[in-house]
Design a protein with these regions (language model features):
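Short hydrophobic alpha-helices and adjacent helix-cap/hinge residues
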Residues: 18-322
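Sec-dependent signal peptide recognition
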Residues: 2-8
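Repetitive helical segments and hydrophobic/amphipathic motifs
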Residues: 11-12
C-alpha cells in the first residue's frame, strides 16, 4: 500500500510539472563556473500573468546577481491539495529554499517545514494568513489603495460610486475590499460590492456593476485575474472606467493603474532569497516588506474607446500601453 501511495504522489507531481504554463519544471540561473548551485523549489498556486511575472522576477534576481541556481517549478493548478503535495515533496527532496507564490502556496510551504527557508510573494496580509514563522519572510502585494482612488478622481472627478468585484472566499481580496472601503470613505466615495466564488458568476456581477457604478476597481484577486478581458470589455462597452491594482489588468483592457509590479515583487523576493542562501542571513532577520506603487500605466486603446482625455499632470507621468 505504501509503495502505491508513493507512486501516486510521484505521478501527481509529474502532472503538476507538465501543467506549468508551458515552462519546463526545472531551469537554471546563469552564474560563473564552479560556484555552488542552489536548489530552489518554486510553488505557484495558479498560473495567470501577475503570478507568472512574480516567478520570472524572482529568477531574474538570481541571473542578475550571478548566483547559480536550479529552479524546480511546480503549479498547483488552483488546488490546495496539490499545493500541500508540492510543498511536502520539496521538503522531502531537501531543497535549499522554497519560493511560494500566493497565499495558499505559502501556507502549504509554511506548514510543511520549520527548517527550510521559505520566501513568499503576492500575499496581501501574511500576518492574517498565518504564515509568519522564523523560517519565513517575503514580499507582500498590499498597496496604498487611497492613492489609486485619488488617481481615479483626477481623471473622472464626477465619480461617486465605485464598483468592486472580488472572490469572497479569497482572504487577500476581502482585506483589499476593506482597505478600499476605508479609503473611499475618506474621499467621499461610495463602494458598490459584488462578490463571487466562481468564474461563471462574474458576467452577471459585472452587468450589475455597470448599471450601479460609475467606475470599477479590480483588486489583485486570482479569480478576477482569470477573466480580466471579459470584465473590461463589458465595462468599456458601457463607457465605464476600469482601474486595476496592477499592470496585468491594464494589459487586459483596464484603463489605468498605479498599482504594484509583480515582476518587481518577485525580484525583491529573489534578492531576499540570495541574502539567505549566499550571505547566510536567517529569514527571521529579514522583515517582510511591501513595495512602493509603480508608475502610472494607461491602455491607449481603452482610452480611445472611452473617449476621455487625461489631465496633463497624469498624462505626463503615464506609460502608454498598446
Amino acid at each position: 500500500m505504501k509503495k502505491l501511495l508513493i507512486l501516486a504522489s510521484t505521478l501527481m507531481l509529474m502532472v503538476l510539472s507538465c501543467g506549468n504554463s508551458g515552462s519546463e519544471s526545472k531551469s537554471s540561473g546563469n552564474a560563473g563556473t564552479g560556484s555552488k548551485k542552489y536548489r530552489i523549489g518554486i510553488t505557484q498556486i495558479v498560473s495567470h500573468p501577475a503570478l507568472d511575472s512574480a516567478r520570472e522576477g524572482f529568477k531574474a534576481a538570481f541571473k542578475e546577481a550571478g548566483v547559480n541556481a536550479e529552479f524546480d517549478e511546480k503549479n498547483a493548478n488552483g488546488e490546495t491539495t496539490n499545493s500541500n503535495l508540492i510543498a511536502n515533496n520539496f521538503v522531502s527532496s531537501k531543497e535549499d529554499l522554497i519560493f511560494a507564490i500566493a497565499t495558499n502556496a505559502a501556507q502549504s510551504a509554511s506548514q510543511a517545514t520549520n527548517d527550510i527557508p521559505v520566501v513568499f510573494a503576492a500575499i496581501t496580509d501574511p500576518q492574517s494568513a498565518g504564515i509568519l514563522k522564523n523560517n519565513v519572510t517575503g514580499v507582500s502585494d498590499r498597496m496604498d489603495v487611497k492613492q489609486q482612488l485619488e488617481l481615479l478622481k483626477k481623471i473622472a472627478p464626477n465619480t461617486k460610486n465605485v464598483g468592486v468585484i472580488y472572490n469572497s472566499s479569497e482572504q487577500n481580496s476581502k482585506i483589499q475590499v476593506e482597505d478600499l472601503k476605508k479609503a473611499a470613505k475618506e474621499l467621499g466615495l461610495n463602494i458598490v460590492e459584488k462578490s463571487v466564488v466562481q468564474a461563471n458568476e462574474i458576467p452577471q456581477a459585472v452587468d450589475n456593476l455597470v448599471r450601479e457604478a460609475d467606475a470599477i476597481y479590480l483588486p489583485t484577486d486570482n479569480l478576477v485575474a482569470s477573466v480580466v478581458s471579459l470584465i473590461t470589455e463589458k465595462a468599456t462597452a458601457a463607457k465605464k472606467i476600469v482601474f486595476g491594482a496592477e499592470a496585468a489588468h491594464v494589459k487586459g483592457g483596464a484603463l489605468i493603474t498605479q498599482g504594484v509590479s509583480y515582476y518587481e515583487i518577485g525580484k525583491e523576493a529573489g534578492k531576499m532569497a540570495i541574502e539567505i542562501l549566499k550571505n547566510g542571513k536567517k529569514p527571521s532577520e529579514i522583515k517582510f516588506k511591501t513595495m512602493p506603487l509603480s508608475e502610472i500605466e494607461v491602455n491607449e486603446k481603452t482610452l480611445a474607446a472611452l473617449g476621455i482625455s487625461l489631465p496633463e499632470d497624469v498624462k505626463s507621468k503615464a506609460k502608454m500601453i498598446q
